Amino acid sequence: MPEEAETFAFQAEIAQLMSLIINTFYSNKEIFLRELISNASDALDKIRYESLTDPSKLDSGKELYIKLIPNKTAGTLTIIDTGIGMTKSDLVNNLGTIAKSGTKAFMEALQAGADISMIGQFGVGFYSAYLVADKVTVTSKNNDDEQYVWESSAGGSFTVRADNSEPLGRGTKIVLFIKEDQTDYLEESKIKEIVNKHSQFIGYPIKLLVEKEREKEVSDDEDDEKKEGDEKKEMDTDEPKIEDVGEDEDADKKDKDAKKKKTIKEKYTEDEELNKTKPIWTRNPDDISQEEYGEFYKSLTNDWEDHLAVKHFSVEGQLEFRALLFIPRRTPFDLFENQKKRNNIKLYVRRVFIMDNCEDLIPEYLNFIKGVVD
């Protein structure tokens, strides 16, 4: 018997923000996945940090990962993490009744023409789920509480109830019920493209449940049964039959040979890790070999040649950042095209991709330099 659900009203500013997200047309809706993966990564950071002083915190699940499960039949996209999880009060407060300080600021920025992709910087990235979903459920289990489910179709209210279904162990499972006109976000290729663009350097494995096909050899038993049935029918008829024993033996032999091998195609699912390239800019330059720099450069730029030079440094103080910059071996063919949009340096914040057209990062005369700033 399902537990009774409590209904809560969204805090006024949050309800306003959700209405704005749902009723305004935004072209880059794909950022919803970046935000949810980023939140999952934060939750994993928290449990890992707690486990440093108390290893027993990981008794509820040692493996730290993020998993994506598209289901075209049900029209859902599920995002699971084995992070710290949320208590009942976390679900009520964080997802609806207490407005983050950035809620109002973000709405004002949106109305002034800011890009929806800035949503995460204001601490309200979760609500970007409603760019592509008309209903969202969040199942969560924290070590200090029972398992609860938060649910909302964004109509000004949400429900929270105890959950006795499949136990998570620890962590959070978000199920997005995808809008009918957004089902391309259930395609494996689309999910891979978004993760590769925005979340390639998240510090935990991001696994995608993919459907694959393999060839399988089976014995042709069904054909046997069918043949036996046909023979029985023939025996039941009264007409006499002349048999050639030699021919029969040959036919039997051929039948057996054919029966031995029949190849069928079988579908199966398995987890595929999407973010195997690790963010080497977070490591100490002394520990990184030239081969590793070379591999990273090629994966970043799709250049087939090695780089000419590399500079890897960090700045600490009021403003903190790490930079890994490469000079390519060859001059770009469009070096002197002034109108071309520059996107050679990717800007990340805490390993999450933000933009690749930040013109203030480097002067125009150095626009051939490639790399990352985090």
Swiss-Prot record:
GO MF terms here are:
ATP binding; ATP hydrolysis activity; ATP-dependent protein folding chaperone; insulin receptor binding; TPR domain binding; unfolded protein binding
Q: Where does ATP bind?
A: 39, 81, 100, 126
| UniProt xrefs under Pfam families | HATPase_c_3 (PF13589), HSP90 (PF00183)
- Say if the entry is tagged with keyword Cytoplasm: yes
Question: Which stretches does the entry tag as region Disordered?
Answer: 213-262
Keyword match Transit peptide: no
Gene3D superfamilies, per the entry: 3.30.230.80, Histidine kinase-like ATPase, C-terminal domain
Query: What PANTHER family does the database record attribute to this sequence?
Result: HEAT SHOCK PROTEIN 90 FAMILY MEMBER
Q: What is said about its interaction partners and assembly? A: Homodimer. Interacts with shu.
Q: What is this protein called?
A: Heat shock protein 83
Top-down, what is the taxonomic lineage of the species of origin? Eukaryota, Metazoa, Ecdysozoa, Arthropoda, Hexapoda
